């Protein structure tokens, strides 16, 4: 599948590349699992509600989440961190 990143998600991903390789590896494992299994698999996938209806989240760790949706052959990644984290 094609991976499409929002600006915020890409910024989060670049942050993890510089700051924490363990978290980066977890994000890559989650993306690989999303590519293979869609809305099931590791990271406790759960559908989001209300304004984010149609999106799903998976746990990166205790605080951070990857937020995504799948349409046709594309994974749209909206977030891969926490909006609580100071940059």
Task: Report the location of each language-model feature.
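Enriched for short, Lys/Arg-rich terminal
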Residues: 2, 11-25, 29, 42, ...
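Residue-level signal for threonine
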Residues: 6
């Amino acid at each position: 599948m094609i991976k499409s990143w929002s600006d915020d998600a890409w910024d989060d991903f670049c942050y993890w590349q510089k700051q924490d390789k363990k978290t980066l590896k977890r994000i890559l494992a989650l993306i690989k699992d999303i590519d293979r299994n869609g809305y099931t698999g590791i990271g406790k996938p759960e559908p989001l509600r209300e304004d984010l209806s149609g999106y799903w989240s998976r746990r990166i760790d205790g605080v951070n989440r990857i937020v995504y949706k799948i349409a046709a052959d594309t994974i749209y990644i909206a977030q891969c961190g926490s909006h609580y984290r100071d940059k």
